[in-house]
Amino acid sequence: MAKKSMIARDVKRKKMAERYAAKRAALMAAFNAADDPMDRLEIHRKIQALPRNSAPSRIRNRCWATGKPRGYYRDFGLCRNQLRERAHKGELPGVVKSSW
């Protein structure tokens, strides 16, 4: 189980990224469309002025059952340990143990 403070920090980052997503996307579109280097520099400064935690790259994928950040499977939203446990119990429809 991950520390509750780390899980809370990640939730805070998700909310902040959602809040600033439109503004960040507009600035990035303007940055990519700008031809003048001075305009690009000004827009870049505005992007840098946004809160650091509003960047989507700072959000960490976490297991919804345990909060673990490592060994995360996107298809299920679970870490590898929980995926194995729940697959053995039959709680994941369509997941079967492979044999050949």
Swiss-Prot record:
Keywords: Ribonucleoprotein, Ribosomal protein, RNA-binding, rRNA-binding. It comes from the Bacteria. One of its GO terms (biological process) is translation. The keyword Lyase does not apply. GO terms for molecular function: rRNA binding; structural constituent of ribosome. One of its GO terms (cellular component) is small ribosomal subunit. InterPro entries: Ribosomal_uS14, Ribosomal_uS14_bac/plastid, Ribosomal_uS14_CS. Part of the 30S ribosomal subunit. Contacts proteins S3 and S10. Belongs to the universal ribosomal protein uS14 family. HAMAP family: Ribosomal_uS14_1. PANTHER family: 30S RIBOSOMAL PROTEIN S14 (PTHR19836), SMALL RIBOSOMAL SUBUNIT PROTEIN US14M (PTHR19836:SF19). Binds 16S rRNA, required for the assembly of 30S particles and may also be responsible for determining the conformation of the 16S rRNA at the A site. This is Small ribosomal subunit protein uS14. It comes from Parasynechococcus marenigrum (strain WH8102). The gene is rpsN.
